[in-house]
Structure formats: C-alpha cells, structure tokens
Amino acid sequence: MVKLEIKNVTKSFYRNEGKQSTLINAIENVNLAVNDGEFVCLVGPSGCGKSTLLNILAGLDNPTKGQVVLNGRPVTGTGPDKIMVFQENALFPWMKVIDNVEFGLKIAKVEKIKRREIAMQYLDMMQLKKFAEAYVYQLSGGMKQRVSIARALVLDPEVLLMDEPFAALDSQTRDLLLVELQLIWAKTNKTIIFVTHNIIESVCLGDRVVVFTNRPGKIKKNIKIDYRRPRLTEDDNLKDFQRQVLYELKSEMVHSRKEKIDLF
C-alpha cells in the first residue's frame, strides 16, 4: 500500500545576481511513490535538492508546483505524522536524556506515567536505557543521534525523515548505527526516507536507492536493493549494488560537465 506520494513536485527560488534576479529550480517534476514500511534512500550530487525535497515532505517548506500526499491527504504543514532527524542533533543539552525523549509526548499532553513508559521503551530499543538520567552534554556524538532517533520514534510518526544523520560520525560509530537502525526499522515497520551522500550507507540501508540528477534535481534512477538484512557495510555481496549507484552518479557528473562544455 502506498504511504507517501510525491506528485510532480517542483521547487523554485530567486537568486540575486547584482541588479538582476534569476529563477532557479532546485528540484523539478519529481514523482515518487513510497510504500508503507518501505526504507528509501535518496542520493545525488551535492546541491541537487535532496534536502529541499525532504523539507517539503516534512511540511517545513511548500512546493512551487505539485503536491505531497501522505495517507491520501495533502501535506500542508508540519505535524507529528512526519518527523525529521537532522545531521546536527536538536537535543536540549541542559535536559536529561529521558526528558529530551519525552519532550514531544509532553507537548502532546500524554499522561506522565504513560510517556515515561513509552520513552523508556524506545531508549531500551536504542540501547540507552541505562543513560536515561544522564545529561545530553555527557554523551558521545553517536549516542546523541540515538537519542534523536528515539525522540522521533516515541511520537509514532507515519514517516520518519532522516537528513544525513550519520554524516558527522566516525566510520566505526556510523557502521554500528547502520545496523541498529535496520534492526529498529524491522521492529517498528516504519516508513523511512533517508537522505545521504554516502553510497555504501544508501545500499546498506535502503529497500530502494533513488538517484537524483544535478540541479534541477530530477529522479534519474530507482535501484532496488534485493538483499537480506541486517546488512553490513563490509559485505562483498553489496558491492554490485554499490557499483550500480556509483555508475549512475558518475554518468550524471559526466553528462553535466559535457553540457557545460557544450555551452562554450
């Protein structure tokens, strides 16, 4: 069953160049259907509009043309049905871990005992239960991202949106979190859309890897990753999938450079 539909979405903005303004399309005519419980990774050249699209999906920005439909209803703004996890955590460092995870539930006026129960359930899932009373500033970068994911999941969103959440982490911590995220996804059956510039990461996580063109960002290729889980980054059986994604990205770079050369 389709959970999320992106229908002919274009996002434009004006860029000032001296006394003139130039209309720029960040993304153009993007169409994508994401099934319930599917894990979709978005990759593409820097500046191709992946994060712009994610902001539109979250309701943080509006498309210039087209629409996003979640569970049959147009997305018109933010809400607990679609939660974003960013590269830089948005945790409150002066609060304890448990208070950060409970924060959204408190805003939603969930009864205190119930919200503590839910928060502890997800901290346990993220292997952070024993750090519930620690302060955020006492945690490592990887642990902070786990808290961010737990805080997003406690609200039971329809779609979890992740914008390069592991980009700032060291490779060892990232690889560990890649496995943990797959296990959590299997337990919760959440629909996840994950933006990354890392090919290995995308193939390790995604049911599909959606490759974007250079700006204006359009969908160039959908690559299905039909392989068992949990996946490890070191698994040689994933290398063919990685090569497919790399080929599409490199061919896009070559095509883009040729177009620029042909202009002269």
What are these regions (language model features)?
Residues 106, 113-131, 183:
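Conserved ABC ATPase "signature" region
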Residues 154-158:
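A short, proline-enriched helix->beta-strand linker immediately N-terminal to the Walker B motif
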